[in-house]
Amino acid sequence: MCAAVNSTLNTKHSALVLFAHGARDAQWSEPFRAIREAVATRRPELTVELAFLELMQPALGDCVAQLVRDGHTRITVAPLFLAQGGHLKKDLPRLLKDLSVRHAAAKITVLAPIGEVTELLNAISEWLVKSTAR
């Protein structure tokens, strides 16, 4: 189940699902949880959740199902992946197709992976330049 940031009865229709790979080490997810909290704080009108491809819970399908049960009709999936490998080229489209069939009343869209966002790449590059400056 999604660890709802907003646990009261849903009066919102839109949700954002941050989608990460997952890992065996529970601490691995902390940066993603921090991002979820930051977005939820800045966008209180939006339900913000975190879901995983594997190794951690909730799975994307379980998270979307819970959001639909809670009355969300617009769900945006944001892949928190730096590069498009097999998971984004094969696994995510397959998952999204299945979710769109199972939850036809909800509009499910997907954003570009964060690794394709110019502002993020520029921020990483800037941090690396500053970190190695003498």
Model regions and ranges:
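Active-site-proximal alpha-helix that buttresses catalytic centers in soluble enzyme cores
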Residues: 1-134
